[in-house]
Amino acid sequence: VAGTIAAVNDNGIGVAGIAGGGKGRKGVKIMTLQLFDGMNSCSLAMEARAMKYAADNGAVILQCSWGYNSSKANLIMGYTPGPATEEEWAATYPLEKEALDYFIYNAGSPNGVIDGGLAIFASGNEYARQSSFPAAYSKCISVAAIAADYTPASYSNYGSEVLLCAPGGDLEYYGTPGEDDDAYDENGTLKEQGAIFSTLVVNGVAGYGYYEGTSMACPHVSGVAALGLAYAKQQRRHFTWEE
């Protein structure tokens, strides 16, 4: 995710980030805030502290490749449905909504490039006809995933709450490395992949790999948003978060 946004370009290493800069061009700055502990658990209090810290310390884009299951998630597939409406989500997770609103209304500056913040979320991967929350919140930008041929990815949530789609990959096209024989040619060489190649933790070590999901689509939108704001700053333009 971070590599998709801000990996340095033109350095002969790894991948090129959408807003990574390179060869004398400045890239965007990333503020990394840990939400989940080592057991993959996150409390609402931890989440709220991170969002408030981001708003208070200069971040203007909230890149969130996480969320609950869609309320339309397939029970047969073992999914536990999440909130169905904005009202239900707000009533169930009031601290989360309050923290998001704080970021959206208090990030940025009236004198800067943007007054307020952009909250960008992955729509979810249950192939459901509704985006998951918090992505489905009307003040957030919900991002669905498309495959290499620009068609909807086989796993991506969709529906009226989704505002944008971006490359998220789809391993259904070529097979999963290490799992499917058709991912390799007759010489055992990895063939073309339908997933996103990015910086990735491999066996606990920083590396590179292929990954799919709306979580990979989301940073494409965040990266483009960062580029747009950087250009607007050069032009001395000003926007509100709604614009």
Describe the predicted segments one by one:
Residues 1, 60-192, 197-198:
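Catalytic-core segments of hydrolase enzymes
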Residues 1-46, 57-60, 67-72, 114-115, ...:
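Subtilisin-like serine protease catalytic core
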Residues 24, 39, 76-87, 200-205, ...:
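Short helix-coil transition/hinge motifs at the ends and kinks of transmembrane helices
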Residues 42, 91, 95, 216-223:
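Aromatic- and histidine-enriched alpha-helix N-cap/loop-to-helix transition segments
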Residues 43, 85, 89, 209-214:
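Alpha-helix N-cap/helix-initiation motif
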Residues 9, 37, 124-126, 147, ...:
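Short, glycine/serine-rich, charged loops/turns that create anion-binding
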